[in-house]
Design a protein with these regions (language model features):
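Short, hydrophobic alpha-helix immediately C-terminal to the catalytic nucleophile
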Residues: 13-18, 163, 167
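Active-site-proximal segment of RNA-dependent polymerases
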Residues: 17-79
Length: 201
């Protein structure tokens, strides 16, 4: 779901994202991660997919497989502490950036007062669905329990987190597993391979 923010908050987040986070994050991304980066985008991802397809065909012919996938409820299940920790590593845990990110992530927290103590104790690691959450009666959302997970799709910081949060997976697939024909756009990805077993692995 998309949640709006105040104009002053939006200005702060634009500056933080455009001038601070994106230049640092971009250095860590594979070229075939196409979302939310100037000069890339959905058209760039389509072009890269076509390039991969052509190169694959020249190397392997028409034998092989393409595995398409996405991260289940990706934005709903981004854990704030992990995302913030990854971002702060880019800035040697700078105190001011830490403070600013903490304020923003706090605004993303989800009221889960309706949960039992058992549900609350495991909610960070259970799959959260914001669409189902919207069906919870408002009178059960009392502000007593908050979950530090989930980000707002419409927020610019969420877009930065979306491209960066799984970057270790990108690097693992691309470089450790040597999958040249791999690309990702936010939570959607693909791998082309002549080996079905390798893709299943």
């Amino acid at each position: 779901s998309i949640t709006s923010i105040t104009p002053s908050d939006r200005i702060v987040r634009h500056v933080l994202c455009d001038e601070v986070l994106i230049p640092a994050v971009e250095k860590k991304l594979i070229y075939d991660n196409s979302a939310s980066i100037k000069g890339r985008g959905i058209s760039h991802q389509r072009e890269r997919f076509e390039v991969h397809l052509q190169k694959y065909y020249r190397k392997y012919g028409n034998e092989g497989y393409i595995l398409f996938g996405d991260f289940t409820k990706f934005y709903d299940n981004i854990i704030h502490e992990l995302a913030k920790k990854e971002l702060l590593r880019l800035f040697d845990n700078d105190e001011f950036i830490d403070w600013l990110l903490t304020l923003i992530f706090d605004s993303f927290k989800v009221d889960v007062s309706y949960m039992s103590d058992d549900e609350y104790s495991s909610c960070l690691y259970d799959t959260f669905n914001k669409l189902d959450y919207r069906k919870i009666p408002k009178n059960l959302l009392t502000g007593e329990k908050w979950m530090a997970k989930s980000v707002n799709i419409g927020d610019q910081l969420s877009q930065v987190i979306g491209i960066y949060y799984p970057y270790r997976i990108d690097n693992y697939v691309k470089y450790v597993r040597s999958q040249k024909f791999y690309g990702r756009y936010m939570d959607d990805w693909y791998i082309m391979s002549p080996s079905k077993e390798e893709l299943e692995d």
